[in-house]
């Protein structure tokens, strides 16, 4: 068979006008020679300028053809291209992606050389994000060299993306299954490769896949949109590749597992928006499909983390046994060994040597603990029995996932060094003891680059097993005389070699003549640290206070001339020296990237010198469930300022804080709210933003997504409310105004909110909350200002089901559920209008239930900044 072209490149296009030119440029620049290629631009009903651009290229080049059709989806678009293809081979390229200049030449040459062996080949895939960074894929642990690979021997290739090329078999060409709403590419690849069960790989060619931030939700891969769709793909895969003995073909098993794995890690496996009964049924359906995957397929996958292997094995609910030997322990099913280990692993997150005591904090991770109870023992010197170490469930049990995948155990211990020479830990399983190995995170003072810590005359050194290349214990020495002087010189030489500039910062530490307190808000933000600094600054108590700023010009007008002398630029030399000598860091944000001039990772280099207490002032009352951000085990927080009994209970129950961590003074900003000011006849409507309706930061600006925004339930229902004749009439009747205030991230969408009423205004910039009679919101923490003012609140969440699914926010549940909040909870414009009318007719007096919740919420109302100062100085005096 003779073909007029070496290859046909099929480019499906839907509203891709910004990407078409770069895509075509990569094809025009192919080393094989552009005239030897056919380019099929398939316009799938675009509504932007895509078709005109494509037509221009088709008119300019005779080997570029435009196919236009009504919008039918990417599968139908590719099928149209396949039917029209005149090249010997067919290559697929999405409009927002590109390929390397040599790709077509390398691909066609390889296919020509192996034509009878394979029907499909792949080539190297690189993910590229908005910042231009590229990164590879785990399948290249298998596909290492250009060759033909037997899929029965390499089941975990799991080719799932369209960096592929197939033979053009004309009438015998396979088409994409248009009944699949997703994973149509995976099924097409399986169909084209399973007849020969071989796949070609061309390492020299590259496909650059443009990964949009937030694309998981935008493209419909989120369970909210597609849970039944991806289960249908699982069903089709299992029906098509079922073997005569009833088992699923192992190549199909590996592809199933691959999909389970990336969905688990991306938190898009479970349909959290289902009610309890529906959710349990959904989990059972997932268990059925993971049950089709053999244990050894799970255990041999290069894509799956070993601890996630345990998760999937337990998900299958197969019977298992645990064996405990004198030196090893194992977990196994009837046919497969799941776990085979000789020791547990301790992950140390915080290590600190102070006042003759070694503080160690971290978590125990051991594969066997997913299946069996485990204990941890501290062994000092030759103590054979050891001392039990208290274990609590670790926040890191959500391992590389938002789902609790494993049973890890948190520990914290303070070990007096006096009289001891060695420290080690053992785990106990079924009465048998096993040793441990140690891993140190970037925030721990110990690690591969720091095997010794010295404080005063105490030296603690890590034990390193050279054969196993692991850390196994700590050796303790009390130094004196010449040994002390020599070791001190060695330590200084080590720090000098490790970080030349940092060494001189270390030498400047510990030189303070008085107490130093640092106050931090975030760039561009005036928050609790500012208000507390203003309160504390004039107090004569021998404490030097400094407020940290990113840019003097941005904030200097907030300060008096005298105060400006104590403004310090973030990450400046002065900031670093003050930080190393500070006794308190008061910050509205608890990330080290906000309050530390050294950032998070380099901070460990100075950890043995730091004495500051990190006081987290908060930037609002935490009412959304955000364990990965706020758990004590994950954070650098020493003490936390709380304003309510709710917060104390919440931080204890959900985030692992203890009574000693709380400062119950209330946030300093609250003291600036004027509770005596009479409100104007105004209502504020201030919703939060949605992560699925706006793009990433590009050049310090969020990328807008107008199509998604305008079609969203969030926008449509808010607009219905704002344009409602009933709302206009209500405002006229009671002589009221309503200010709609988008979240700052969403302010660029303000132009889309239109109203015919002169009483409704769309605001930009700040608003003074004391001037409003009431607030309408969804999840905004500003609601607590109105609780503080004893003014009514209404909740309005038109996309509540999407919120529960995890589509709209970084959280999907509330620590303080809206149904138990401070006002009626509504989801439609009609419900909101009805509740608003009731409140207005009742002269803005909330129902008794909501009044009581407001009155009982705050610990204090007034003087929070002074109370905080008293709490901080009381502890200092103690």
Task: Report each predicted region and the residues it spans.
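Catalytic binding pocket for nucleotide-activated donors in carbohydrate/polymer assembly enzymes
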Residues: 659, 752-756, 781-857
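Short aromatic/hydrophobic "clamp" motif used to bind/position activated sugar donors
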Residues: 90
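Short, well-formed alpha-helical segments that are part of the catalytic scaffolds
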Residues: 16-30
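Glycine-rich, basic loop-to-helix element that forms the pyrophosphate-binding segment
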Residues: 69-85
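A conserved acidic beta->alpha catalytic loop
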Residues: 26, 43-52, 94
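Conserved donor NDP-sugar-binding/catalytic core segment of glycosyltransferases
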Residues: 102-137
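Active-site and donor-binding regions of nucleotide-sugar-utilizing enzymes
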Residues: 360, 396-399, 424, 428, ...
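Conserved catalytic-core segment of nucleotide-activated headgroup transferases in glycan assembly
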Residues: 247, 524-533, 537-540, 668-752, ...
């Amino acid at each position: 068979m003779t073909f007029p072209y070496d290859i046909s490149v099929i480019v499906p296009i839907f509203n891709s006008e910004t990407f078409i030119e770069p895509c075509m440029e990569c094809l025009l620049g192919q080393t094989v020679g552009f005239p030897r290629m056919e380019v099929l631009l398939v316009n799938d009903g675009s509504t932007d300028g895509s078709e005109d651009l494509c037509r221009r290229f088709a008119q300019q080049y005779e080997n570029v053809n435009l196919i236009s059709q009504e919008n039918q989806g990417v599968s139908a678009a590719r099928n149209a291209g396949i039917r029209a293809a005149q090249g010997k081979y067919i290559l697929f390229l999405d409009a927002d992606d590109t390929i390397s200049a040599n790709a077509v030449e390398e691909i066609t040459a390889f296919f020509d050389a192996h034509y009878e062996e394979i029907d499909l080949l792949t080539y190297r895939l690189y993910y590229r994000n908005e910042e231009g960074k590229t990164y590879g894929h785990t399948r290249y642990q298998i596909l290492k060299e250009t060759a033909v690979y037997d899929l029965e021997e390499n089941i975990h290739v799991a080719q799932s993306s369209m960096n592929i090329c197939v033979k053009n078999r004309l009438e015998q060409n396979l088409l994409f299954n248009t009944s699949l709403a997703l994973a149509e590419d995976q099924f097409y690849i399986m169909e084209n490769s399973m007849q020969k069960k071989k796949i070609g790989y061309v390492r020299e060619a590259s496909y650059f896949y443009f990964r949009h931030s937030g694309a998981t939700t935008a493209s419909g891969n989120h369970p909210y949109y597609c849970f039944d769709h991806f289960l249908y793909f699982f069903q089709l895969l299992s029906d098509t590749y079922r073997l005569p003995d009833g088992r699923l073909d192992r190549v199909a098993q590996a592809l199933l597992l691959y999909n389970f794995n990336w969905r688990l890690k991306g938190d898009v496996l479970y349909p959290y928006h289902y009610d309890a009964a529906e959710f349990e049924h959904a989990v059972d359906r997932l268990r059925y499909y993971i049950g089709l995957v053999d244990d050894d397929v799970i255990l041999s996958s290069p894509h799956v983390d070993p601890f996630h292997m345990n998760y999937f094995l337990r998900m299958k609910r197969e019977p298992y046994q645990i064996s405990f030997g004198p030196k090893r322990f194992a977990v196994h099913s009837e046919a497969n060994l799941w776990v085979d280990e000789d020791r547990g692993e301790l992950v140390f997150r915080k290590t600190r040597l102070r006042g003759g005591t070694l503080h160690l904090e971290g978590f125990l991770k051991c594969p066997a603990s997913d299946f069996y109870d485990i204990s941890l023992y501290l062994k000092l010197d030759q103590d054979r029995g050891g001392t039990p170490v208290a274990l609590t469930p670790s926040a890191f049990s959500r391992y590389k996932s938002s789902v609790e995948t494993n049973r890890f155990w948190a520990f914290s211990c303070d070990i007096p060094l006096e009289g001891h020479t060695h420290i080690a830990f053992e785990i106990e399983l079924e009465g048998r003891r096993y040793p441990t190995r140690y891993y140190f995170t970037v925030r721990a003072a110990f690690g591969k680059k720091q095997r010794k810590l010295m404080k005063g005359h105490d030296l603690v050194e890590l034990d390193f097993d050279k054969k196993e290349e692991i850390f196994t214990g700590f050796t303790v020495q009390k130094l004196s005389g010449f040994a002390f002087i020599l070791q001190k010189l060695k330590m200084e030489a080590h720090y000098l070699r490790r970080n030349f500039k940092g060494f001189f910062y270390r030498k400047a530490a510990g030189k303070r003549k008085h107490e130093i307190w640092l106050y931090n808000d975030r760039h561009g933000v005036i928050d609790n640290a500012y208000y507390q600094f203003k309160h504390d600054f004039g107090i004569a108590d021998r404490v030097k206070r400094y407020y940290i700023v990113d840019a003097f010009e941005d904030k200097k007008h907030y300060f008096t001339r005298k105060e400006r002398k104590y403004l310090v630029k973030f990450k400046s030399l002065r900031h670093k020296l003050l930080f190393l000598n500070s006794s308190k860091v008061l910050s509205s944000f608890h990330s080290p990237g906000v309050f530390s001039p050294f950032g998070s990772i380099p901070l460990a280099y100075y950890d043995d010198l730091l004495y500051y207490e990190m006081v987290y002032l908060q930037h609002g009352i935490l009412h959304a469930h955000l364990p990965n951000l706020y758990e004590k085990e994950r954070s650098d927080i020493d003490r936390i300022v709380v304003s309510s009994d709710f917060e104390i209970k919440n931080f204890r129950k959900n985030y692992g804080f203890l009574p000693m961590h709380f400062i119950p003074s209330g946030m300093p900003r609250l003291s600036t709210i004027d509770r005596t000011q009479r409100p104007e006849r105004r209502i504020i409507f201030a919703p939060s933003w949605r992560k699925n309706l706006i793009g990433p930061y590009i050049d310090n600006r969020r990328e807008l997504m107008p199509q998604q925004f305008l079609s969203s339930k969030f926008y449509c229902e808010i607009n219905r409310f704002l344009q409602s004749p009933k709302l206009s009439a209500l405002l006229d009747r009671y002589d009221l105004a309503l200010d709609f205030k988008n979240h700052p991230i969403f302010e660029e969408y303000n132009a889309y909110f239109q109203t015919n009423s002169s009483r409704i205004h769309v605001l930009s910039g700040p608003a003074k909350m004391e001037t409003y009679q009431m607030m309408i919101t969804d999840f905004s923490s500003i609601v607590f200002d109105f609780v503080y003012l004893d003014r009514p609140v209404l909740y309005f969440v038109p996309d509540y089901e999407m919120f529960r699914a995890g589509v709209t926010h970084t959280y999907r549940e509330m620590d303080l559920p809206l149904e138990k909040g401070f006002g009626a909870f509504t989801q439609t414009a009609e419900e909101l209008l009805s509740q608003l009318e009731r409140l207005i007719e009742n002269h803005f007096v909330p129902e008794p239930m909501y009044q009581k919740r407001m009155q009982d919420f705050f610990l204090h109302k007034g003087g929070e900044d002074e109370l905080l100062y008293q709490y901080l100085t009381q502890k200092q005096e103690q």
